[in-house]
């Protein structure tokens, strides 16, 4: 007996004992057979459309009528009726050619046994031996019972695979647009005599699984060669196959059963294995074979037609290593679609997403999703990244439609506060409380009326959107029903749906959409819900993903960009020429007219120490990101040795730290829109510049792990002191200084490096007038720090001139000024504050008095 038969017998004995029956009757056994999880009898009844709950209820009634024996303790034994069924089951097993007596043999024996009690029950539920035999043949196929666990080998594909053709017939698969060449190639390989196993190879997100789904859709539409019409495409679920295989050999058993079912279908079933590389090594334990080895013989003989899908990296890593497995598959390369093709693919999918989110998606949104994702999301592939953008933008609007609008929410919160206040004031007895109560009542009445109006408008708009969503879903269902009726040859039904219900529903939808558009036009000012996804919604999602501002510029931002130099001048004094060059680069990028294949700007800032080179970079970061720390700052003095280059892009394979990635590449991967500062660039080893050539020219760099990092949205600034002696020489004219600096640069850097820089910016040495401006900037910072302590401070002109004169040093620039402010102003001031002479609320007046400052 099989395991399930033994379990059923034991359960039947326990049931008889519970019911105090004198012996185990066939009804007890039948009851357990019908209730058996993963058993075969429930599957037979399913196929015969027998309502199991009703069947069990009738059985229970029969069992309850059996005579009962009290006193207990007696041993349970099989009744003569059951023994007769045992013998019949043995005969049944021999007839089927099985080595074990299985549960279905008992069931067939009961049907054929001529037991009057059971016959009545079967007749009432229209269960006949012939029908049961047909159902059983369907379930078992050509399998024989050769071990004690046959149930795991019946209908294994239903357990461990998804029927893609069935899903396609029900309209549950997304339409597949384009990709005709690849599908034709797959069909070509499938039609070979041997080794008819295509494997789809491509980058993640280019649509490999979609090609398999496209083939399923074509099989259903009969848009395939004759040898594929009516075939089933099943997607194997490796996870389900491995999960729960507790004993050694159980996984192999399951896989053998899958292979057997596919091969015995005589080519009717094509297997699709997504993530094909999971086959190699799957289920491998010591002494066991892995899945790949079990599949090889069937694949080579052409008995098992299989479509695989995997990425380039995994194919190389797992499948190419096993040459015997590799030669059984024929590769079909799936390239990333072009921008135009991706737009076509999105247009094909648009309807599915509109139905799901209940929102219209404009064509402009589809185009901008593809173009923006192609330009700004460089580490992923089309069409997947563009589909994700559209999906998220539509999801955002869909959520807004379904949740209470902000205006309504705000009013309801106000109402809540007023009601709480009203309850508190009711307890007060004085006049002012009564007056306030009257005011609150009036406010509550007004807000209630306003809320009522807004809620009605929201419900009305929401109702319109929901109505359109429901109609679209209905139309989708009707189209599936039409296709099904046409396939089944029910032309009457197809005509009724196609020329009756479908046009009617489409007409309704058109009318609803027209009304909705009219309403949107007439009340565009007061409209609460937005019901279509536009390009600006997509741009907003891109900005959230990448941090790159691609959304439409607001008035305030365009004004800010036009006057960018003025904001930078508040921090950087005396270097107007340098600020204009940087501002122009940022404006070009934001207007989207700069070269999309290069960084926003690459500059080299030259000049003596302390003239504001690094300060300009910080000011730029604060202007762009409101945070001066948003600079990817790399001190090139740390890269003096040749081997330090690997710290920038990450260690090569085989070295410690390979997994970590490089300092420069990782920070730009995380923040693609940033200011990169390479400080003191002349201190680095010359080999470092070889790496920078790629960044300066193509805006890209490949890190130690072979990933391409995109620098197209960065501003790259290098600072250097090369030629600062010439800049400081008072006897040289501007042109002579520039000549001397260029000469020094040519000596220090290679021509191919200098030639790739957008602009070499010379910072002038600072004069006394500029130092005076810097004093004001620094004193503003001091005042800011004191304001936090509630202390005011002001300076007269003499004090400013005194600090400027004392802090001026043409060689060291503005840095000595900070030290002077520290010693002359901050040190004595700190003593005054600590001693308690200066307290919160005071204002300090600072004046110059000869050689010191007085407070």
From Swiss-Prot:
One of its GO terms (biological process) is cellular response to heat. The keyword Cytoplasm applies. The keyword Cell cycle does not apply. Residues 155-336 are annotated as: NBD1. Residues 1-66 are annotated as: Repeat 1. Keywords: ATP-binding, Chaperone, Coiled coil, Cytoplasm, Nucleotide-binding, Repeat, Stress response. ATP 1 binds at residues 202-209. InterPro entries: AAA+_ATPase (IPR003593), ATPase_AAA_core (IPR003959), Chaperonin_ClpB (IPR017730), Clp_ATPase_C (IPR019489), Clp_N_dom_sf (IPR036628), Clp_R_dom (IPR004176), ClpA/B (IPR001270), ClpA/B_CS1 (IPR018368). Belongs to the ClpA/ClpB family. NCBIfam families: chaperone_ClpB. This is Chaperone protein ClpB.
């Amino acid at each position: 007996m099989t395991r399930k038969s033994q379990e059923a017998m034991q359960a039947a004995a326990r049931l008889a004992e519970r019911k105090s029956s004198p012996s185990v009757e066939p009804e007890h056994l039948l009851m357990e057979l019908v209730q058996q999880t993963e058993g075969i009898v429930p599957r037979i009844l399913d196929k015969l459309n027998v309502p199991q709950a009703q069947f069990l209820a009738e059985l229970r009634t029969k069992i309850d009528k059996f005579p009962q024996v009290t006193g207990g303790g007696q041993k349970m034994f099989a009744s003569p009726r059951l023994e007769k069924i045992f013998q019949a089951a043995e005969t049944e097993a021999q007839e089927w050619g099985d080595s074990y007596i299985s549960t279905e043999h008992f069931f067939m024996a009961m049907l054929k046994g001529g037991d009057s009690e059971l016959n009545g029950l079967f007749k009432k539920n229209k269960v006949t031996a012939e029908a049961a035999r047909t159902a059983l043949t369907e379930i078992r196929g050509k399998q024989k019972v050769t071990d004690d666990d046959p149930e795991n080998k019946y209908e294994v594909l239903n357990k461990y695979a998804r029927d893609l053709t069935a899903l396609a017939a029900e309209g549950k698969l997304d339409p597949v647009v384009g990709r005709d060449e690849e599908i034709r190639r797959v069909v070509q390989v499938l039609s070979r005599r041997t080794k008819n196993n295509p494997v789809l190879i491509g980058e993640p997100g280019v649509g490999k699984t979609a090609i398999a789904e496209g083939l399923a859709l074509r099989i259903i539409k009969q848009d395939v060669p004759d040898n594929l019409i009516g075939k089933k495409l099943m997607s194997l679920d490796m996870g389900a196959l491995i999960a729960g295989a507790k004993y050694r050999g159980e996984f192999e058993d399951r896989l053998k059963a899958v292979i057997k079912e596919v091969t015995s279908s005589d080519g009717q079933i094509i297997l699709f294995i997504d993530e094909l590389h999971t086959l190699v090594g799957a289920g491998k334990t010591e002494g066991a074979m892995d899945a790949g080895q079990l599949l090889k013989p069937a694949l080579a003989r052409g008995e098992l037609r299989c479509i695989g899908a995997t990425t380039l990296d995994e194919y190389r890593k797992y499948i190419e290593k096993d040459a015997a497995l590799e030669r059984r598959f024929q590769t079909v390369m799936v390239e990333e679609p072009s921008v135009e093709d991706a737009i076509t693919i999105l247009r094909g999918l648009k309807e599915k997403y509109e139905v799901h989110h209940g929102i219209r998606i404009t064509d402009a949104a589809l185009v901008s999703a593809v173009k923006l994702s192609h330009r700004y999301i460089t580490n992923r592939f089309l069409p997947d990244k563009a589909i994700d953008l559209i999906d998220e933008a539509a999801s955002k609007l869909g959520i807004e439609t379904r949740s209470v609008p902000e205006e309504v929410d705000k009013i309801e919160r106000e109402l809540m506060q007023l009601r709480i206040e009203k309850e508190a004031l009711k307890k007060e007895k004085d006049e002012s409380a009564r007056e306030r109560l009257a005011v609150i009542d009036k406010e509550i009445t007004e807000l209630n009326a306003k809320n009522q109006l807004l809620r009605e408008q929201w419900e009305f708009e929401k109702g319109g959107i929901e109505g359109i969503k429901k109609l679209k879903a209905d139309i989708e269902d009707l189209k599936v029903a039409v296709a099904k009726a046409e396939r089944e040859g029910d032309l009457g039904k197809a005509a009724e749906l196609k020329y009756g219900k479908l046009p009617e529903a489409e007409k309704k939808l058109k009318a609803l959409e027209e009304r909705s558009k009219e309403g949107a036009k007439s009340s565009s000012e007061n409209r609460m819900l937005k019901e279509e996804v536009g390009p600006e919604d997509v741009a907003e999602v891109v900005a959230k993903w990448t941090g790159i501002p691609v959304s439409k510029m607001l008035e305030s931002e365009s004004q800010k960009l036009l006057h960018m130099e003025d904001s930078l001048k508040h921090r950087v004094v005396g270097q107007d020429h340098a600020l204009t060059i940087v501002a122009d680069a940022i404006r070009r990028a934001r207007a989207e007219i700069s070269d999309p294949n290069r960084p926003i700007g690459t500059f080299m800032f030259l000049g003596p120490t302390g003239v504001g080179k690094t300060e300009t970079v910080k000011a730029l970061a604060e202007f762009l990101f409101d945070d001066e720390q948003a600079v990817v700052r790399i001190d090139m003095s740390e890269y003096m040795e040749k081997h330090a280059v690997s710290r920038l892009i990450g260690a090569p394979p085989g070295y410690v730290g390979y997994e970590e990635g490089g300092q420069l590449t990782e920070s730009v991967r995380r923040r693609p829109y940033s200011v990169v500062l390479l400080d003191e660039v002349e201190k680095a080893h010359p080999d470092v510049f070889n790496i920078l050539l790629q960044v300066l020219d193509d805006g890209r760099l490949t890190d130690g792990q072979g990933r391409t990092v995109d620098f197209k949205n960065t501003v790259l600034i290098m600072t250097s002191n090369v030629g600062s002696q010439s800049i400081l020489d008072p006897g040289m004219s501007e042109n002579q200084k520039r000549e001397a600096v260029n000469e020094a640069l040519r000596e220090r850097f290679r021509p191919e490096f200098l030639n790739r820089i957008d602009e070499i910016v010379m910072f002038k040495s600072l004069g006394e007038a500029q130092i005076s401006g810097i004093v004001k900037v620094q004193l503003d910072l001091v005042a800011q720090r004191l304001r936090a302590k509630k202390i005011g401070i002001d300076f007269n002109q003499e004090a400013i001139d005194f600090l400027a004169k004392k802090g001026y040093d043409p060689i060291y620039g503005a840095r000595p000024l900070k030290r002077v402010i520290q010693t002359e102003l901050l040190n004595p001031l700190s003593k005054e504050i600590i001693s308690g002479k200066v307290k919160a609320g005071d204002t300090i007046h600072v004046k110059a008095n000869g050689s010191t400052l007085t407070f």
